[in-house]
Amino acid sequence: LAALASAPALAAGRAWQPAGFVALGDWGRRGDPVQSAVARGLAAGAREVASRFVIAAGDNFYPGGVASIRDPHWKDSFEAVYVDPGLQTPWYAALGNHDYRGAPQAQVAYTGHSRRWRMPGRYYKASGAVCGVPDLDLFVIDTSPLVDDLNLDERVQQLCRGHWWQAEAEPEIAWLRDALARSRAPWKIVVGHHPIYSGAHGDSPVLIARVAPLLEAFGVQAYIHGHDHDLQHIRRGSVDYICSGAGSQGGRVRAIPGTRFCLGQPGFAAFRLRPEVLQLQLRGAAGEVLYSAALPRTR
């Protein structure tokens, strides 16, 4: 934790160029009307913020993931839906619980067969040099092995496919701690499928105990997730928790302690990163801005 004594300085000697990106979760429904509508709004939002990449926050393929890299789901839910030129950028994807009902490794493998799909592992880091935003490090984690021992349905789904969450969780937590400790980026964002704090499915005690302290300790500014089929902005401590899980469906949501905004309708999140502020917009299916907030780099 000694590395946290002072925040890293912003890259010097160059003019800052505002960097945009967009995020959506819970989206892959073979191009159904709601998914397609949100895809059009996402494209408009991506153009407006000059998006450099897309965050896909899990549950990428409903209802049971993909079976292989040749599964028709890839075309029906991804390649043939997000066709706008503004979305032909890297997609940094996380795994969700529905993805584990198929072959999650196929989503990792698809990275080698796609010009834009990025999932080099179940959890990984995309540095600023990789994602095209020099002052940002992006950390994508796989939350299902961390939380699904508390959910009987998901536990059975995973056990039937040989996923032993206890064995998979410890190395991931150790990796996240080490990766955050090593990061010198002024901006750090962590992406996972499941919420840590939630006004829909409810808080995750495991993630509160094991992930939230790492976010606080290592100066992470934001945690972006899906799972809840809604749009939320919650601030707890020094971290902003942003739900963008409404890529193909809306759902019920309520305000909880720390809630700045919540709405249970389809949509997505758009961001514009500046040296000291991350501008957040939660947008509806048509791309309209429903809520905006300026998230400071230091709290």
Model-predicted segments: where are they?
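N-terminal export signals
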Residues: 1-12
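N-terminal active-site segment of His-dependent metallophosphoesterases
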Residues: 10-73, 171, 178, 198-199
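Residue-level marker for buried hydrophobic side chains located in beta-strands
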Residues: 21-23, 54-56, 93, 190, ...
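Active-site flanking residues adjacent to catalytic metal/cofactor-binding acidic residues
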Residues: 25-26, 58-59, 141, 192, ...
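Membrane-interface helix/loop caps of multi-pass membrane proteins
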Residues: 51, 57, 95-97, 136, ...
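Extended active-site neighborhood of metal-dependent phosphoesterases/phosphodiesterases
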Residues: 62-187, 207-222, 228-274
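Short acidic, glycine-rich surface-loop motifs adjacent to enzyme active sites
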Residues: 183-199
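A short C-terminal boundary segment appended to hydrolase-like catalytic domains
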Residues: 260-261, 266-299
